[in-house]
Structure formats: structure tokens, C-alpha cells
Amino acid sequence: KFDADKLVKMIPQEYADFRTDVLENHGIDAPELREIDTGGSSFAQNTQSDGAKALLDVAFKHPIKIIANALGVPPDWMIQMGKDNDCKVAALLGTAEHAINQVKAGVDILVVSGTEAGGHCGSVSTMVLIPEVHQAIQPYGDVPILAAGGIVTGKQMAAAMAMGASGAWCGSVWLTTIESEVEPVIKEKMVAANSSQTVRSRSRTGKHSRQLVTPWTQAWEADSAPEPLPMPLQPMVAEPALQKVNKLAAGGHE
């Protein structure tokens, strides 16, 4: 059973002090962050079976045609829920070994994500990974591949299909659209950033994820910084702080 209070007790005070100091060093007064609470625990709850099932129950009340699982092979019950609701099950992955495991588990679509991808990603580049996965899964069946990771333009999509993909899976680009819930100031930073202004960092979730280089990511790279905690503890450290930053940024705080 999910117990947010138990997770809170697993987070050392050092982490609450560190996140608070990072914000205060950049002119943000956040004394409340020196106390660890259950803020940010919804992420942890949603990674548990009960939380995931509750989300899928809501999702399947709508006419969706695909669900996607990440950070591991989807459990049998999730794949079965997809079949029962005439919905394809996709899996995000970052290595050829992961691709084979996903095909054996019975997923319908492989979203093969290179290290250029925003969010959680591995260390293998898209150009290397797509043909490697395409070749690796041949003995196990004809499962379509969607290439992901640094793909925005038609030229990039065409290149992905030339390497064996059936299509492309775009993610970060949609965060900059009018329909996106991302704050306008963050959208502007994303559009303005070049390819050298992102970093794979464990500072947000405890697992490597690509994000914009910010004072937050830089602080966690410092020699004096504590080692990021494993998932789901690190999100409980990071999310309350980052949500405060986003709120202030939306209000004009630099």
C-alpha cells in the first residue's frame, strides 16, 4: 500500500536544506522548503500499480487509441487493459536489450528514444539506436518502431524512417505550442535554447532526464551537492521547489 509519510521519513534533512539554499541563493525566499512533506508524492503514487490503474480507468473513459509505458516493461495487466479497450500499448525504451524485452512482453509499438530526447532518456544517440533496435528485434516479430529523441522537422523524420523506423514520436516540441500548459516564460526559454543548452541530469526525478541547463541543474552538479536520491524520493525533493520557481517565473521573477 502506498504510504507517502513513510517516503518522507526516508529523505534526509540535508536535501531539504540544499533545495532551500539553492533557491535562496537566487533571490527566492522559501523557508517552508526546509520541511520535508508529502508534496511531490503524487508522482510516486502514480508509479504504483494502484495509482496507475486509477489513471488508466479515467483514460479509458475517453476514446483513446494508444497508451505508452516508460521506465520498464509494462505489467501484464496493463497490456491486457489495452487489449480489452481496443487500445494499442506502446513502450518507451533506450537500448536494444530493452526493445527485445518489450517485444517479448507483447507491446504493440516500440518508441525508441535516443539520448537527444527531452525527459527520461538513455545514453545512446538516436542515429545509432534506431538501426540497432531495428536489427535486434527481427527474430522476435514485426513490431513497428517510432523514432524519438531530437526529432522535430520533416527531414529528421525522413532520416529516422530511412534507418528502419515506421514513423516518429515527437515530445518536447509540443510543449511549446499554444495548447501546452507550460508557462509562457518557460516556452520562450525552450524555443530560445540551442543544442548545447540541455543536460542529462538526475536532479529532478533521480533518473537521468534531459532538461534545460538551469541554476537548479548546475547546483546539483557541484562537488558540494548531495547525490540525487533514487526515484521516487528525488521528485519529492525537487517538485515543490521547481513548482515554486515556475510560479514565480510566471509572475515575472527573473
Predicted features by range, described:
Residues K1-Y140:
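Active-site entrance/lid segments in N-terminal catalytic domains of soluble metabolic enzymes
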Residues F2-R19, H120-L146, V152-E254:
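Conserved active-site-proximal phosphate/metal-binding subdomains
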